[in-house]
Amino acid sequence: MTYPDKTVYPVASCNDQDFKNLMDVYLDAVFNPNITKYEEIFKQEGWHYELTGKDDELKINGVVYNEMKGAYSSPDEVLSSQIYRSLFPDNTYSKDSGGNPEYIPKLTYEAYLDFYHKYYHPSNSYIYLYGDMDVVERLEWLDKEYLSLYDYKKVNSEINKQPAFDEIKNVEAQYSITMDDSQENKTYLSYNRVVGDSLDEMLYQAFDVLDYALVSSPGAPVKQALIDAGIGDDVYGSYDAGILQPVFSFVAKNANASQADEFESIIENTLKEVVKTGINKEALLAGINSSEFKFREADFGQFPKGLLFGIKLFRQLAV
């Protein structure tokens, strides 16, 4: 599971022996991968030139390359990348953790190995166990088979905070559509702010509630104001607290590019009015109840609870 500032390798099983086998397989894959021995794996999984016939066009192929080409065909993925790039130009969040297909072919095998050997070390990792198991036995096995084989290594993987900008930045980017699609009302408008620190749990809870009260609930003030102005056919908010400096966004999909200034003005004026008159108490209570229910229910669908609890823990380790 690739995140902007970490990669998670989770394993889970209700069968004890299967769980032990999976631990061994994944730990071996992370710390002793064959890709560091065979460049052919890098070419297959990363990128390579491919010529199927002497008269055919030389093409670029590769598992990750094709995956990211597919991802970049999604306007939502492009928007997400552009939000990070515009807000965090001076740290790692400006780079797409999955790889930008435009730049993937510039990655050499040597550069890949340098990166792997620099960061992929037990000293630069967190390993956690969750569930009904013999924890002491698992820790002893982990130390004997893997951790004791390494000396401690100081790895500088600290992420520097992005300083605040002196003024608002306006950024334009493009995404692809089919030849038959009209460009009319295909613009995504996004208003984004960096808010606080991921270690501030109270702030995280507050913005989770504010997201509901301001833009997600029926008749939410920001959402309703944009809808009444005819800006976009889908308005939503998002609060990303999974990185060092959380981001709050308002987004209008399928809008007109000429509405950008009005979009910004409506959001700021509506927020000022909310500050002056207060948030609707019913919406606020509904947001609090929704947030509390999520925590009490702890229903993560197809994902094991231990995995999601761990991911939440990693959010607190973003520094």
Regions found by a protein language model. Give the residues of each.
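Charge-rich, well-structured scaffold segments of protease-associated domains
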Residues: 1-167, 179-207, 212-319
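Long, compositionally biased
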Residues: 169-171
